[in-house]
Structures are given as C-alpha cells and as structure tokens.
Amino acid sequence: MTRGFLWAALLAAATVSAAAGDFDAALAKRLGADQYGMKPYVLVILKTGPKTDLPKDVQTKIFQGHMANIKRLAVGGKLIVAGPFFENAQHYEGIFIFNVAKVEEAEPLLRTDPAVAAGALAFEAYGWYGSAALQETVAIHNRIAKASP
C-alpha cells in the first residue's frame, strides 16, 4: 500500500509541475489575471422589459440596434460574452459578461443598448469572478462563425 501511495504522490507532483510549467506570465499580465488566472467582471441577466406592446416594426428596429450595439461593445473590448437564453418561465432573455470590474461601470454601457433604452429589455447586473481567459472569447468566436445574426 505504501508503494502505491508513493507512485500516486509522484504522479500528482509531476502533474502539478507540468501544469505550472504552462504558465505564461506575459499573457496573464495582458489579460489582467490574478494569481489564479481570474479577474472581476460584471455578469448581466437581460430580462423581458416593461414595454411588451411595441409594434413589430419598432421591435425589429430596436433589436437591429441591439445587435449592432453588442458588436460595437465587443469590438471595443467591453463585452466579452453575449447570448440569448432559450424560452424560460423567468422571462430571462440573455446574458452579457462585461469586461469591467464594477456594476457601476457596466450600467452606462447597458444604457447604450437601444432595447434597454426603449424598455424592451430590463437587466440585473452582478459582480462576477471568472477566468481572465474569457477575454479571448470574441477573437476565437470570430474565427469560427461563418455568419453574424
């Protein structure tokens, strides 16, 4: 049993050592990662807003602006994840993850969204601690998406 424990300990030590050898200090610094490879963001849950009776042509125009705003914020490095929810009982419409540290920094960005400004969408915003690598999502997505909505 002692021999098995020693082999397991050596294997674990080798695994940890290999993982530590993969650390890229320059990348961690560029992404603003802490010692765990993490950083603060703001997670936003978009919900159905109070204006549910907008005419179809107005809704279409608002959501075209919503998509254009998403693209603008992503290109500017402020929005790193965005996407819709499937239909659900909570009336959650989608999520944003903003590359800002505080809710107070995200709120002005949210107010630039035509769907939020028109009341078609409402939001809840929360401080969130996640992998600094999420900032690479937009660049990777642009390489794998054939079309844009």
Positions of predicted regions on the chain:
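N-terminal signal peptide c-region/cleavage motif recognized by signal peptidases
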Residues: 13-17
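Conserved, structured core segments of small domains
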Residues: 19-149
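Bacterial N-terminal signal peptides that target proteins for export
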Residues: 1-8
